[in-house]
Amino acid sequence: FNRXSPGLQGVSSVPLRTYADQPIDADVTVIGSGPGGYVAAIKAAQLGFKTVCIEKNETLGGTCLNVGCIPSKALLNNSHYYHLAHGKDFASRGIELSEVRLNLEKMMEQKSSAVKALTGGIAHLFKQNKVVHVNGFGNITGKNQVTATKADGSSQVIGTKNILIATGSEVTPFPGITIDEDTIVSSTGALSLKKVPEKLVVIGAGVIGVELGSVWQRLGAEVTAVEFLGHVGGIGIDMEISKKFQRILQKQGFKFKLNPKVPGATKRSDGKIDVSVEAAPGGKAEVIPCDVLLVCIGRRPFTQNLGLEELGIELDPRGRIPVNTRFQTKIPNIYAIGDVVAGPMLAHKAEDEGIICVEGMAGGAVHIDYNCVPSVIYTHPEVAWVGKSEEQLKEEGIEYKVGKFPFAANSRAKTNADTDGMVKILGQKSTDRVLGAHILGPGAGEMVNEAALALEYGASCEDIARVCHAHPTLSEAFR
């Protein structure tokens, strides 16, 4: 949060309040405290705006910190350690363990403590930067007014010059299947299962589906993912990478059923669930029994009951709020960022938009290149990409060249005995400019940031090749 616009020094002197009966006056009121909202609120305060942030949940941080990115990464990391110790991996390295036991309760405790520390960190940053935190459901009750309604029915009115909607997204419901967060779960329930299911069926093999499926597969569940799209990894993934990724996951024990539809699921008297799967082309219809059904068919913008209709702000066909390049809605002092606007539903995209949006309010330049926003799947191996895929380049008629390097030929990957995957760079044929980077392998989520930097700076493939990389490192494969 160090970027500052000229002539906007100092911070707000508004004292911290979590709730008040008297009306509050603000320069900027942010609705939502997820990665986009809390970052925007802090930045606004640092730029000298009197800032209020409204959050409907008890804890700050939104989906990402509480029931998304953060807890899932804790479970992915710890389940990977268990998988290494429980399988043959440690023995092959000369580490012999007589007995490995899973303490799921302890694993969940570690996840929760990480979440608690990070959400508490936001509260500390709010206090440090004089951001007023109001707990309640934010409703825009006028062009310059937001009303926050608390769980007990009491309300707080905020008079404000600018309003920033950062309410994020929610799980997309599946027609005909009711989520109870017990045996039929969304990503939220899948992060807090009380025991490892014998059989887990995942509807959707996108980013969230393969990540959470991997967690429980490593801990001992038999996992089957059913994906209508016909490929693994969701939208945006390069197809060559997707096919290799699927093969690696299958080798780990993950099962996939691609192309079929799921018309519904039925709970049996013994508590098990029968998942109906329609016939895919060339296949046959079947019923897959499971202990837990995880529904991962994506997320939708959270825009209900915000008061948008009353203000004349209409949503697009996908439920998103239309904005201009400065993130303004049709009402110039009401802005929107993150999952409620167009673009990938990613925490880091929302963060960037939040900072840039408030800098724009302060008179600064507003620019974001969505082609430089990286995506990561935090399985093992990881998958990461930024820029264009081969499929996109073909569709756009851009002539390109491909550079590939397998981790099997990388010294560090060899010494780590972790050689699955490859690095794939796409460059423009005529100019040598980097157009996209696709990484499947250990540390892909870290390495992709080098690619994002190259894209942002307009680097050529030769520019990257001429940068001296330390040896032996995994990132040499990128060069």
From Swiss-Prot:
Co-factor binding comment: Binds 1 FAD per subunit.
Intrachain S-S bonds: 64-69
Reactions catalysed: N(6)-[(R)-dihydrolipoyl]-L-lysyl-[protein] + NAD(+) = N(6)-[(R)-lipoyl]-L-lysyl-[protein] + NADH + H(+)
Keywords: Acetylation, Cell projection, Cilium, Cytoplasmic vesicle, Disulfide bond, FAD, Flagellum, Flavoprotein, Mitochondrion, NAD, Nucleus, Oxidoreductase, Phosphoprotein, Redox-active center, Transit peptide
Site (Important for interaction with PDHX and activity of pyruvate dehydrogenase complex): 432, 457
Residues holding NAD(+): 204-211, 227, 262, 298
GO molecular function, one term: dihydrolipoyl dehydrogenase (NADH) activity
Assigned EC number: 1.8.1.4
CC terms in the record's Gene Ontology section: acrosomal vesicle; mitochondrial matrix; mitochondrion; motile cilium; nucleus; oxoglutarate dehydrogenase complex
Residue numbers annotated as active site: 471
Transit peptide: 1-19
Modified residues (N6-acetyllysine): 50, 88, 106, 116, 127, 330, 394, 401, 404
Name of the protein described by the UniProt record: Dihydrolipoyl dehydrogenase, mitochondrial
Source organism of this protein record: Mesocricetus auratus (Golden hamster)
